UniProtKB/Swiss-Prot annotation:
It comes from Paulinella chromatophora. Its main location: plastid. This is Glutamyl-tRNA(Gln) amidotransferase subunit B, organellar chromatophore. The lineage of its organism: Eukaryota, Sar, Rhizaria, Cercozoa, Imbricatea. One of its GO terms (cellular component) is plastid. GO terms for molecular function: ATP binding; glutaminyl-tRNA synthase (glutamine-hydrolyzing) activity. Allows the formation of correctly charged Gln-tRNA(Gln) through the transamidation of misacylated Glu-tRNA(Gln). The reaction takes place in the presence of glutamine and ATP through an activated gamma-phospho-Glu-tRNA(Gln). Its EC number is 6.3.5.-.
Length: 496
């Protein structure tokens, strides 16, 4: 695969439409359930199916979530907006139109900043403009039998459980230039939505779906090229790979004298390429007009201000604070703040007295390894933040070794025990009494007279051997600093 870096003078222009399922218990215009995984066509009713005589009523929790999402993305929330009907005919749309927002969306003109870490390049921050956020209803889902798409299938089934679920569609400006930037942007959008609690952002379940619009041009000042829409990417790595493939495909096509046509393409994860799906529609094809069953949306200033005060500290602000105030590296801050429960656990442990860097190392190292191995989350383990802080303080004070702390960690996580109590119960406290350590070393050296003689004759590497035997004899409990000091005192003393 040829990357854009190998095509001198070419630039990619990328924008992303992110469809976020808002995590309300009921759908956007009806009380039908939004529960994922229920039997097909059980979460439907006459409103979802568009039966004659039914009228939609806006779910106020959807409005709240959409406004909070807009505020977190620095969008300007409109005092007045409306719903429109987007006309198109497809089996997954029972009404033959989708209720969306066209020329008066709920919010416009925002931005977020994303941190881009390219391989072998320094991390940089880039501001990505956001054109708009609008509310709309989701469509149903087609299940193709005999193929993963309509072409080649024996027949198709329709599940309308997803139809009518509330979506916030977030449309970026064409400010992205690489697949990596596109993936980081989408990841930051999901992170923000999760921090807000307005969506779980689960890409595998379709809670967050991204459509990428991409074109290439010869130079930064050249007009935009013909854009291609890419669908069917269910991970951030897929977004990056799809962009990189499509950039190379378009450049190759243009260099070969081929014409790029405006179309929608699908990303094939197995083959690692995009394939043509259909020609791309334009806005006029949908024949938008105001929905006559839904009145205008008016959001009073008091209500907007109340929702604004409920916003949490957002990921970018939290990352910056961890670096500036707690001294974490940019990398550590990114990892700790990636999921809100981990960040909350981290802050609770800091409050309980843990040193920030040591705490970050434990969370990113042994604890994350345990979580991954046992397929659990930080919110599900029994080890409380205060108990992890206690463990770190015990290590810092020299009361236990890091090795012993690692050994008892699984039991602490599984049982939620006090580290001090467990250490006392198992007799694992560090031996730091000088006289006790001296006595143990003298007894130990008496077992290795030849090695002691060799050390005194200049074979100083044997010090490591003696330390190893001492740790073995004390089960790793002898204080290393004190032990080394006393060991050298005895070994360097005269044989008499």
């Amino acid at each position: 695969m040829v990357s854009i870096a190998g095509q001198i003078g070419w630039e990619a222009v990328i924008g992303i439409e992110t469809h976020v399922q808002l995590g309300t218990a009921s759908k956007i215009f009806t009380q039908a359930s939004t529960n994922f995984g229920d039997d097909p066509n059980t979460n439907i009713n006459p409103v979802v199916c568009g039966l004659p005589g039914t009228l939609p009523v806006l779910n106020q929790k959807v409005l709240e979530y959409a406004v909070k999402a807009a505020m977190a993305l620095n969008l300007k929330v409109s005092e007045h907006s409306k719903f429109d009907r987007k006309q198109y005919f497809y089996p997954d749309l029972p009404k033959n139109y989708q209720i969306s927002q066209y020329d008066e969306p709920i919010a416009e003109d925002g931005w977020i900043e994303v941190e881009i870490a390219e391989k072998e390049k320094q991390t940089y921050t880039k501001r990505i403009g956001i054109e708009r956020l609008h509310m709309e209803e989701d469509a149903g889902k087609l299940v193709h039998i005999g193929s993963d798409r309509l072409t080649g299938s024996n027949h198709s089934l329709i599940d309308y459980n997803r139809a009518g679920i509330a979506l916030a569609e977030i449309v970026s400006k064409p400010d992205l230039r690489t697949g990596r930037e596109a993936a980081e942007y989408a990841s930051e959008i999901r992170r923000i939505m999760r921090y807000l609690g307005v969506s779980d952002g689960n890409m595998q379940e379709g809670s967050l779906r991204c459509d990428v619009n991409i074109s290439v041009r010869k130079g930064k000042n050249a007009p935009f090229g013909i854009k291609i829409e890419i669908k069917n990417m269910n991970s951030f790595s897929a977004i990056q790979k799809a962009c990189e493939y499509e950039i190379s495909r378009q450049i190759k096509a243009i260099n070969n004298g081929e014409r790029i046509i405006q179309e929608t393409r699908l990303w094939d994860e197995n083959k690692q390429l995009t394939t043509s799906m259909r020609s791309k529609e334009v806005a006029s094809d949908y024949r938008y007009f105001p929905d006559p069953d839904l009145g205008p949306i008016e959001i009073e200033l008091d209500r907007r201000e109340a929702w604004k005060h409920e916003l949490p500290e957002l990921p970018a602000i939290k990352r910056h604070r961890y670096v500036e105030e707690l001294g974490l590296s940019i990398y550590d801050a990114r990892i700790i703040t990636d999921e809100l429960p981990m960040a909350e656990y981290f802050e609770s442990a800091i409050t309980a007295g843990a040193e920030a860097k040591a705490l970050a190392n434990w969370l990113m190292g042994d604890i994350s390894a345990y979580l991954n191995t046992n397929k659990t989350t930080i919110g599900e383990i029994k080890l409380r933040p205060s108990q992890l802080a206690e463990l770190i303080i015990l290590i810092s004070n020299g009361e236990i070794s890091g090795k012993i702390a690692k050994e008892i960690l699984p039991e602490l996580i599984e049982k939620g025990l006090s580290p001090s109590a467990l250490i006392d119960d198992k007799g694992l406290a560090m031996i730091s009494d000088n006289n006790q350590i001296r006595t143990i070393i003298v007894e130990l050296l008496s077992l290795y007279p030849e090695e002691v003689k060799a050390f005194r004759n200049g074979k100083i590497k044997l010090q490591g051997f003696f330390v190893g035997q001492l740790m073995k004899k004390t089960s790793g409990k002898a204080d290393p600093k004190i032990s080394n000091k006393i060991l050298l005192e005895i070994l360097n003393a005269s044989e008499n």
